[in-house]
Amino acid sequence: GSGQARLATAETEQRPTVLGLIASGRMRPDTGVVLIGGAENNSAVRRKVALVDAPDVSDPAPNVTVFTVVSEELMFAGRPSNPIATKAWLTEAGLLGISRTPIADVAPADRLRILLELSVLRPDVEALVLVSPDRHGGDPHVWWELAEEFAGRGLAVLVIAGQAAGAVLAGRAARAEMDETEVAR
């Protein structure tokens, strides 16, 4: 439900992205359905669920600067995305100092905060699916705190990460109920 953060674990390189695509209504599962408000409606799911940092799908190219990432995401959100607006967003977020840094070189926590904050600017977004934050390294508790922070704003948050990160968060992160045997066989 909304206002909650859930963790799903998935191994192999492709599986987290596949789960993310299914959970965000961008791919049909072989079996089962994704429901929003109890009804199956892929276009509504796609509008309401932001797929965040999914490898090869929604992650920014590694050599792109933070400034460019922010400018593009502001545009996708229907916001002013000119250099002045982009600089203002970065300043307000306290990130102007890293604006010229390639996104691949940004600390994991800052990278995820940038991408999550920009995702929630989109008009209809009610839920976030964050894919493989553990691939950037760092402490899983840091990105889990981010997930809980966004859930605290009333968003539904699903984080899909590897089992090692899941083990670190055992007892802390509420688990998503997904039948792994039916997904991406």
Residue ranges of predicted features:
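Phosphate-binding P-loop
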Residues: G1-S2, V120-R122
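Short acidic, S/G/P-rich loop/turn micro-motifs used as interaction or catalytic elements
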Residues: E13-R15, D56-P60, P133-D139, A164-G166
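Short alpha-helix immediately C-terminal to the ABC signature
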Residues: I114-L121, E148
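Pre-Walker A (P-loop) beta-loop-beta motif of ABC nucleotide-binding domains
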Residues: G1-A10
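Actinobacteria-biased recognition of intrinsically disordered, low-complexity terminal regions
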Residues: S2, A85, E149, A164-R185
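ABC-family P-loop ATPase nucleotide-binding domains
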Residues: A54-I114, D124
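Conserved catalytic loops of ABC-family nucleotide-binding domains
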Residues: P123-E126, R135-V168
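ABC ATPase nucleotide-binding domain signature region
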Residues: A10-F76
